[in-house]
Amino acid sequence: VRSPLLWTLIASVALLFGVGGWLLTDPATSHSEALKTGGLAGGAVVALYALWLNDRRRRVEEARQAIEQQRHDVDRERISDERFAKSVELLGHEADQVRVGALHALAGLARTRPEYRQTVLDVLCSYLRRPFTHARYGGLEGTAEQERELQVRLTAQRLIRDLLPPSDVDGPGPDLDLTGAVLEYFDLSHRRIGGLLLRHASLYSSTNLSGCVFTGQAYFTAAGTGPGRLVGLFRCRNATFLDRAWFSGTAFSERATFSETTFAGRTTFKGATFAKEVLFDGATFSDSAEVRLPDGWELKPQNGGFVAVPV
């Protein structure tokens, strides 16, 4: 098989002699003009070949770079998967500092690879759903092991908040499943959250959901704030529930604040108990037929919606 270069040279020489010979048949054309024109025709073929060759080299280089990028992406994904698997494995390590390191490694992975964020949040939530008790919840002094595990869990809580987007961004937020979790100083304030499951969760010390935007359904069914020394303050001021907000059977052992909060979907506090005061001043609801408030509060029409006022 002859190379394109050989065919180009043959075509160039053929044009040189062909065009030159044809022009020489014209008596008005000199020998120098005929050779010059033939040379230009042959040179044009060579120039076209050079352009084709340059384009071919460019396409080959682009293909090589694409292959290199694919190889890099595959290696990066493999390393990320290995890093994720190793971090999850270390969450079961006996040493608390190793577990804390594994939590930070997972959070770091979620920051550098956004596609891992929901998966990492699922792992952090599953860690917090593990059975846990601390003597301090009963007013006693806990063991060293309980205290170490508490610090690991507080780290997981902080990392969850850090990985959630701010409340003022657009789009749905990540989902959190904390069903039955034991939480202390739980703070998601000013974050954007998709669905939130806190069914049967135990909330000790303060819980702060102020300024949150919930784009999915939020369930606090049968959750409870802690009594005793670690009083369960529940703050949900100026939050927004775009979908269902379910507080049926929730037990609030200390003051609960829902001031200036917007409930855009179905909302119920049926069966909820409040040991201290509950505040709904400035809270708005989209449809009174879909709302059940605790005793002592009622809805009044306002600006096309409804606002909660004390009875």
Spans of features found by a protein language model:
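N-terminal leader/targeting and pre-domain segments
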Residues: Q70-D73, E82-A107, R111-G138, G142-V311
